[in-house]
């Protein structure tokens, strides 16, 4: 593995353990040339997953899009980066556990909203407003009432 600091190939693993999600391995590495340490993660290679968009276009699954949407919904909320990462991990695990080659954005959105609803009401409403494309205040209020009725 190349060192991200000096690009040397002369690196070695100094510690290896399961990552927090137990689906990957966290490795601490040391560059023998520059002496700097860095972390890598090893994950099982998964089958390519195709996401079906609302307009029926298809594109390859991209975890960073889920992360970006959740981060935007949680912006300026008292939610740690670890909590957001765990939420994204949970959604991703559930997506891949289905063992399907294609998944719709609507299903991914519902999985995210289910978790955000339990995590933070404001983040949930923010995500839902974009995901469900609220056209006016009335649809927004209807969603708020539904959420408040379930609490």
From Swiss-Prot:
Keywords of the record: ATP-binding, DNA-binding, Metal-binding, Nucleotide-binding, Repressor, Transcription, Transcription regulation, Zinc, Zinc-finger
Molecular function in Gene Ontology: ATP binding; DNA binding; zinc ion binding
Pfam families associated with the record: ATP-cone (PF03477), Zn_ribbon_NrdR (PF22811)
ZnF start-end (unnamed): 3-34
Cofactor remark from the record: Binds 1 zinc ion.
Record has Zinc-finger as a keyword: yes
Domain ATP-cone, chain residue ranges per copy: 49-139
PROSITE patterns xrefs: ATP_CONE (PS51161)
InterPro entries: ATP-cone_dom, NrdR-like_N, RNR_NrdR-like
Highest taxon, organism lineage: Bacteria
GO BP terms in the entry: negative regulation of DNA-templated transcription
Cysteines joined through disulfide linkages: none
Cofactor(s) named in the record: Zn(2+)
Family named by the database record: Belongs to the NrdR family.
Role noted for this protein: Negatively regulates transcription of bacterial ribonucleotide reductase nrd genes and operons by binding to NrdR-boxes.
HAMAP family in UniProt: NrdR
Protein name: Transcriptional repressor NrdR
Biological source species: Agathobacter rectalis (strain ATCC 33656 / DSM 3377 / JCM 17463 / KCTC 5835 / VPI 0990)
Gene: nrdR
């Amino acid at each position: 593995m190349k060192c991200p600091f000096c690009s040397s190939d002369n690196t070695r693993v100094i510690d290896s353990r399961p990552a927090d999600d137990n689906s990957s391995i966290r490795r601490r590495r040391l560059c023998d040339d520059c002496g700097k340490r860095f972390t890598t993660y090893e994950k099982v290679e998964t089958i390519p997953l195709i996401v079906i968009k609302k307009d029926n276009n298809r594109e390859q699954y991209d975890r960073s899009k889920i992360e970006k949407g959740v981060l935007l919904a949680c912006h300026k909320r008292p939610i740690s980066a670890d909590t957001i990462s765990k939420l994204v991990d949970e959604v991703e695990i559930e997506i891949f556990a289905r063992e399907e080659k294609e998944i719709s954005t609507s299903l991914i959105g519902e999985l995210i909203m289910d978790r955000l609803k339990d995590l933070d009401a404001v983040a949930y409403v923010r995500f839902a407003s974009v995901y469900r494309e609220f056209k006016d205040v009335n649809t927004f209020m209807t969603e708020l009432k539904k959420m408040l009725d379930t609490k």
